[in-house]
């Protein structure tokens, strides 16, 4: 972080005002500055430290003004080797990251340092990560569907172009795989730009994602920004803002429609809780920071559509102990346009993506936006699945034979619908040996309408498993019949 950077939104120039470290407690560092030279909140400070093996520059972000010429900062790197009396310089601007085409195909950390090709982007344009959301008169008023080619999403929980989508679910139900699939589909089908923020997740997952995207040929259209779980809380708290800043440049300067993926937004909240405790704030509900709603709002309000261009955000949200009343996921709910809940029971049935069709929601699933036919078919699918859910207790206790004839027909139809909601993913081809399917929305609506009307009640249930369209179902049925 020794290269000089510029920033296009009035962050100021490098003032190089020197202070000195007076206290170090883990990642929290108190710095004393000369009278009248106190750095502004969120300014980046640099401290040079020398370890036995290497000299390095620490980046500290100003979090509090304590009075008596003292500021409390949060370090973005481990503070090993930092001692009292170390000289600290004020850069006069916030943490800044490279923006533009130079970031595509590369991996960055929260400070904007390129990890796979050191030095990349530091000679070009830089934007500070703390920015205001777009003005009200710049927001896009039109609502448009983002067609994904994934049947269960397009039909029952349609995504809003320029909206915020939450992927809810416990550990191991497929949140990261669904995000990888969306990145692949956006790059292949729409030639769109994606920015991925890895917030507090496993380093192994980040490495796997990078290698898989390179293998799939979509890395050149994606910027990756990582602050993984082995990093200090300051980094994990800021990495989402760094990725969002890169996405904002593509939207505001290049006029592109961008997809921003955040995995995992819960770790953003968790890092904020750690920082809040380190700064001495009184904890709020369930031990979370009292500023939880404010911090979440600062991030989410910048993710929006402006006139003619958009940032659509897909956010994986870990739900602690599958408790949806936990303040972290509950606070995120208020900002979302659509929620996709991944269900463990559906995952255990071998149906992927394991989206729960009854609890997943979308604010645009109404006739005035998606159309009367789409709305009618989606509601009919939900009605049949809901009735099947109500009958499951009776089936478990008394068996299918005790049901009325019309209920037996409905149960069979519901099971076919349930299996048909799954489909093969492009990113899973090497595991399943089956090609991934992309189903147009028009075909999805027609297929589910025909299944709901009973046109395929004569086909075996297993023929519907992980199929793309009705042609795949009929082919699978013939294959089963031939055995």
Curated annotation (Swiss-Prot):
Subcellular localization(s) per the UniProt record: Cell membrane
NCBIfam families: atpD (TIGR01039)
Protein purpose: Produces ATP from ADP in the presence of a proton gradient across the membrane. The catalytic sites are hosted primarily by the beta subunits.
Signal peptide: none
SMART domains, alphabetized: AAA
Name of the protein described by the UniProt record: ATP synthase subunit beta
Alphabetically ordered keywords of this record: ATP synthesis, ATP-binding, Cell membrane, CF(1), Hydrogen ion transport, Ion transport, Membrane, Nucleotide-binding, Translocase, Transport
Chain residues that bind ATP: 169-176
Catalyzed chemical reaction(s): ATP + H2O + 4 H(+)(in) = ADP + phosphate + 5 H(+)(out)
Gene Ontology cellular component terms for the protein in this record: plasma membrane; proton-transporting ATP synthase complex
Family under the similarity heading: Belongs to the ATPase alpha/beta chains family.
Gene behind this protein: atpD
UniProt-listed Enzyme Commission number(s): 7.1.2.2
Superkingdom classification of source: Bacteria
One of the record's GO molecular function terms: ATP binding
Membrane topology note: Peripheral membrane protein
A Pfam short name: ATP-synt_ab
Assembly: F-type ATPases have 2 components, CF(1) - the catalytic core - and CF(0) - the membrane proton channel. CF(1) has five subunits: alpha(3), beta(3), gamma(1), delta(1), epsilon(1). CF(0) has three main subunits: a(1), b(2) and c(9-12). The alpha and beta chains form an alternating ring which encloses part of the gamma chain. CF(1) is attached to CF(0) by a central stalk formed by the gamma and epsilon chains, while a peripheral stalk is formed by the delta and b chains.
Translocase keyword on record: yes
């Amino acid at each position: 972080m020794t290269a000089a950077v510029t920033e296009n939104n009035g962050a100021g120039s490098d003032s190089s005002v020197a202070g000195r470290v007076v206290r170090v407690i883990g990642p929290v560092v108190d710095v004393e500055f000369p009278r009248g030279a106190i750095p502004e909140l969120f300014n980046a400070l640099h401290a040079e430290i020398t370890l036995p093996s290497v000299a390095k520059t620490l980046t500290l972000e100003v979090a509090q003004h304590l009075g008596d010429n003292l500021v409390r900062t949060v370090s973005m790197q481990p503070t090993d080797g930092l001692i009292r009396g170390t000289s600290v310089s004020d850069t006069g601007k916030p943490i800044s990251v490279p923006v533009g085409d130079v970031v595509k195909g590369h991996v960055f950390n929260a400070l904007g340092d390129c990890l796979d090709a050191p030095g990349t982007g530091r000679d070009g344009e830089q934007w500070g990560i703390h920015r205001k959301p777009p003005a009200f008169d710049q927001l896009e008023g039109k609502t448009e569907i983002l067609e994904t080619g994934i049947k269960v999403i397009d039909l029952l929980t349609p995504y809003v172009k320029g909206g915020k989508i939450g992927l809810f679910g416990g550990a191991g139900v497929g949140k990261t795989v669904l995000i990888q699939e969306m990145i692949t589909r956006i790059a292949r089908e729409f030639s769109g730009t994606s920015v991925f923020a890895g917030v507090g997740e496993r380093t192994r997952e980040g490495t796997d994602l990078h290698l898989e995207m390179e293998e799939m040929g979509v890395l050149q259209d994606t910027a990756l920004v990582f602050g993984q779980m082995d990093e200090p809380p300051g980094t994990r708290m800021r990495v989402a803002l760094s990725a969002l800043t890169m996405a904002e440049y593509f939207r505001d300067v290049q006029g592109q429609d961008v997809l921003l993926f955040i995995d995992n937004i819960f770790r953003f909240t968790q890092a904020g809780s750690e920082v809040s405790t380190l700064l001495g704030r009184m904890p709020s509900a369930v031990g979370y920071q009292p500023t939880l709603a404010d911090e979440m709002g600062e991030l989410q309000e910048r993710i929006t559509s402006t006139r003619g261009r958009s940032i659509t955000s897909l956010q994986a949200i870990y739900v602690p102990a599958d408790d949806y009343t936990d303040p972290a996921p509950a606070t995120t709910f208020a900002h979302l346009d659509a929620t996709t809940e991944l269900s463990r029971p559906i995952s255990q049935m071998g149906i992927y993506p394991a989206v729960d069709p009854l609890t997943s929601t979308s604010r645009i699933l109404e006739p005035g936006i998606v159309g009367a036919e789409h709305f009618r078919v989606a509601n009919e699918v939900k009605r049949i699945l809901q009735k099947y859910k109500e009958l499951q207790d009776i089936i478990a206790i008394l068996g299918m034979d005790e049901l009325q004839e019309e209920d037996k027909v409905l149960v069979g139809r519901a099971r076919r619908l349930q299996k048909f909601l799954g489909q093969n993913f492009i990113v899973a081809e090497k595991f399943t040996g089956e090609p991934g399917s992309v189903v147009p929305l028009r075909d999805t609506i027609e297929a589910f309408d025909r299944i709901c009307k009973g046109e395929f009640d004569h086909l075996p249930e297993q023929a519907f498993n992980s199929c793309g369209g009705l042609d795949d179902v009929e082919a699978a049925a013939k294959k089963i019949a031939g055995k």
